[in-house]
């Protein structure tokens, strides 16, 4: 583990840690120094009653000085976006219903599905008591009776 002379922390720019962890400790020391410098010189925006854009900057004597910042530099936060993540997942009651598709293809498809279902019902009712596959019509498609085609030759 590295060590450092702690008696003189004010002027530690020229001092470095020594030892096996010296690189990490030197980096952490620089980060800590930068954070403390940033805390002392930070400019924080203030809201005033007039709505002016003013910031408070610490001065050398410890007091704070208010500085007016042009609106081109300091922008007030805009309105929140209209589309947020929570609104994307919420149900929208004002949306228009989707109109039904009036294609003839849909009607034909629905009637074909109905015919297949009715064919399947009749086919299963006739073959329900029989155990052999020889009575199944080989000309019917496999989707109707749910079995594989058998080569009878």
UniProtKB/Swiss-Prot annotation:
Specify the domain of life of the species encoding this protein: Eukaryota
Q: Which residues lie within the region annotated Disordered?
A: 43-153
Where composition is biased (Basic and acidic residues), the residues are 49-68
Where in the sequence does UniProt note compositional bias of the Low complexity kind? 91-138
Q: What is this protein called?
A: Uncharacterized protein DDB_G0285189
Q: Which organism is it from?
A: Dictyostelium discoideum (Social amoeba)
């Amino acid at each position: 583990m590295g060590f450092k002379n702690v008696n003189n922390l004010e002027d530690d720019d020229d001092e470095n840690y020594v030892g096996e962890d010296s690189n990490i400790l030197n980096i952490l020391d620089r980060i800590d120094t930068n954070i403390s410098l940033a805390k002392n010189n930070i400019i924080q925006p203030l809201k005033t009653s007039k709505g002016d854009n003013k910031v408070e900057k610490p001065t050398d004597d410890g007091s704070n000085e208010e500085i007016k910042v042009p609106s081109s530099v300091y922008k007030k936060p805009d309105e929140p976006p209209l589309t947020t993540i929570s609104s994307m997942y919420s149900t929208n009651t004002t949306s228009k219903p989707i109109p039904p598709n009036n294609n003839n293809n849909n009607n034909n498809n629905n009637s074909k599905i109905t015919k297949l279902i009715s064919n399947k019902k009749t086919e299963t009712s006739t073959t329900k008591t029989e155990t052999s596959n020889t009575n199944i019509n080989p000309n019917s498609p496999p989707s109707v009776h749910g079995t594989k085609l058998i080569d009878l030759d």
